Amino acid sequence: MASEDKFESVLSTRYCKNSPLVSILSETNKATLWRQLWIWLAEAEKELGLKQVTQDAIDEMKSNRDVFDWPFIRSEERKLKHDVMAHNHAFGKLCPTAAGIIHLGATSCFVQDNADLIAYRDSIDHILKRFATVIDRLAAFSLKNKEVVTVGRTHYQTASLVTVGKRGVLWAQELLMAFQSLSEFRDKMRFRGIKGATGTQDSFLTLFAGDESKVEALDELVTKKANFSNRFLITGQTYSRQQDSQLVFSLSLLGAAAKKVCTDIRVLQAFGELLEPFEKDQIGSSAMPYKKNPMKSERCCALSRKLINAPQEALTILADQGLERTLDDSAGRRMLIPDVLLTAEALLTTLQNIFEGLSVQTDNVKKIVEDEIAFLGLEKAMMMLTEEGVDRQQAHAVIRKTALEAKQLQATQKVDIRQTMADPFFDSVRDRVVGLVNNPINFTGRCVSQTESFIAKELKPTIDKYLDKSAGNVQLDV
């Protein structure tokens, strides 16, 4: 059956079809990891002295690790209703010498949980590299526009001047904090290890004739072979699903940060100040050919919503895990965590494309500043007046009255700074303020130095470990 004739997740077929995550999270990779875990377990058991595990058996497992008889596996699972045992039988069929020691001492969660954790770790490593590139692209945009003066907005209303670059590093800070959360999770992530059917390690204690030190060594050795630095010291049958919730929450922070950034871009595109990349043959509307819609930012907001809402499901999976283990978690985890990882990848890929082509509509930005500078210069006037001993509250009251009257005039005519400062109250500072208005950068405070400092002192050092400096630009298929 052709792929177009059956339903497939849009994450893997539309938004992430060229991503390595599609392979990392695939059934084949999962099954390969299960077999690799069986190999590591056998190697470690042999190294610690189990006579029934032979080198011939291990070599046979290694040589057949990547050979899959999928029709047989599906047939076995249909009959047994147990995926791990179906794969166990299939691997044993390929490896008759090893069949008797495959899965020795283990429970299903040895392969299921540990393989999931390896796949999650590898996915996170890729996502962190992508994330670092996204933040780096936004930093470049911010530095490029660090001196481009624009109207600040609080409550979506005109506020004191900022620069486009300073606004860019505010966005970068939100993304960087989410990046740090995910990076910290990655560094602390724990492997399940070998714990047995209910977490007591009794089966392994039996195999090693009651020698607890060898059971501890086996747990450490398998963890090391899987290239994890940390492991759970205690588990039930499964590792704590709180770790899954922490992963999902870290990615939900990415979703929230990205939605804030992309909502801002959409608003600023509506104001005519920014324009997300619009490709040569791109069509904005089937009915209105003149439109340039911020569809990439809109897509990011939609993907972000999925990440923002995901922790609720992860928390219920954690809460419903009964005693040493129930299957309340199984179906949910199979769907939730791969979807969250792929959604994060789709979001970051689209964000990277936006930041690589985001442009400032400088003429319109300049016009908006010129229209508002007559009002925005009054804050500077208030500070100057207080320097001369004027009561700050008195200055505020006079400026408020003057500005509101001028705002009414602005509806029908252009207002300049001399009109808003016509009151004799401003005589001592008027010329100084008017002189500054000719160069609006004078009203942006430390925007330029803040932008440079944040990128140099915080942003760059944080992402450097994961940043691929040779990464090319992203081209979106849709």
UniProtKB/Swiss-Prot annotation:
Pfam family for this entry, one: Lyase_1
Binding-site positions, substrate: 14-15, 81-83, 107-108, 237, 299, 325, 330, 334
Domain of life of the native organism: Eukaryota
SUPFAM superfamilies in alphabetical order: L-aspartase-like
Gene Ontology CC terms: cytosol
GO molecular function, one term: (S)-2-(5-amino-1-(5-phospho-D-ribosyl)imidazole-4-carboxamido) succinate lyase (fumarate-forming) activity
UniProt family annotation: Belongs to the lyase 1 family. Adenylosuccinate lyase subfamily.
Protein name: Adenylosuccinate lyase
Species in which this protein is naturally found: Caenorhabditis elegans
